[in-house]
Amino acid sequence: MERIKVIEYISNLGDGGAETLVKDYVRLLDRNLFDPVVVVLRGGESSANKRTIEENKIPIIEIFHRWNIWVRVWKKLCGWWYIPYRLKRIIRSENAKVMHMHLMILKDVPHVGKDLDSMRLLFTCHSVPSKVFEGERIKEKIAAQKLIRNNQLQLIALHDDMATELNEMFGVQNTVVIRNGIDFNRFRDVSTTKEEKRKELSIPQNAFVVGHIGRFTDEKNHTYLVDVFAEIAKKRKDAFLLMVGAGDTSVTEQRLLEYGLANRYQILSHRSDVNEILRAMDVFVFPSKYEGLPLSLVEAQVASLRCIASDAVSIEAFCTENAVRLPLSSAEAWANVVLDTAIKGNPHANLDEYDMNREIKRLERLYLGEG
């Protein structure tokens, strides 16, 4: 049986949740059935996810090989024809039968034209649908509507509430839920000890380590995270903030300096050892302003960390009593909950539902057209 060529099409290969999911998809798909290739709109990334994909000898095709001011100008002026042209060439040269799309890359896809007619198209919504398809991103919604109408685009949600919202937004009833899956063994069977990882990262052995994983963007709310940590630091002189994520860290670091916490934090990026880094933490704090379903929060629960997260996060991400859900109130109130280990959460989902091996089988059935 000839293997089915699958394109995973995403805007870039950073170290965010969507990019991590794509990395896991192409790594874990049954290679007897599928032949995956990753297509990225913006190349030039240097990330742990990209390295892992390359190590697994999975091709990466870049529409734009670098991303600088000149390329951005070119994209703005000519992207409307160049991107569909490149996609069309890639689909033909790879003889692709399935294209699974992620993040904000839909608007140019309908212009590929007839080459889409014989393909199975899927799109995973990785954030709150209103943030993905409305306001300045209305072109994404228009493109999705065209692809649903003309090419039977299959919408994929990360949880049940998101599926309901997508069904209502696009007037469909068939949105499928495929959760952000995790390789449980990777986060449970970690040979590195807390002491070893702290030594490697130059974190004091006796520190109370407050951890966070997420790219440095507004929705992750790092400013509030620093405010919470500053309140924790008032009460615990051994408090240390460990953040993992790519992006512009200048605002976050300036705020830490203003609080006099210059020697009480560390920022890591492009890491492939997140499972070990979680071992170095005592508590995981996740105060997002809005979210789809954050992979890092579920990973922290699989690693048996106590987690404090905002109620902007889907309720289905709270799977154990170690995960406490809070409104974004005062930083002091959050600090008090972080420090009071007697406060427990109410599980709203089964952690086993996030087993990647289970979710990948569901995805494979979609790729095969078996619903």
Predicted ranges, named:
Residues 3, 8-16, 20-78, 162-169, ...:
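N-terminal strand-loop element at the rim of the active site
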Residues 17, 343-371:
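A charged, aromatic-enriched C-terminal amphipathic alpha-helix characteristic of glycosyltransferases
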Residues 19-24, 208, 212-231, 250:
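A conserved mid-protein helix/loop that constitutes part of the nucleotide-sugar donor-binding site
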Residues 149-187:
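A short, active-site helix/loop in glycosyltransferases that binds the activated sugar's phosphate group
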Residues 306-310:
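Short hydrophobic beta-strand element within catalytic cores of glycosyltransferases
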Residues 270, 289:
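Aromatic "clamp/platform" in nucleotide-sugar-dependent glycosyltransferases that forms part
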Residues 101-107, 125:
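Short His-centered aromatic/hydrophobic patch
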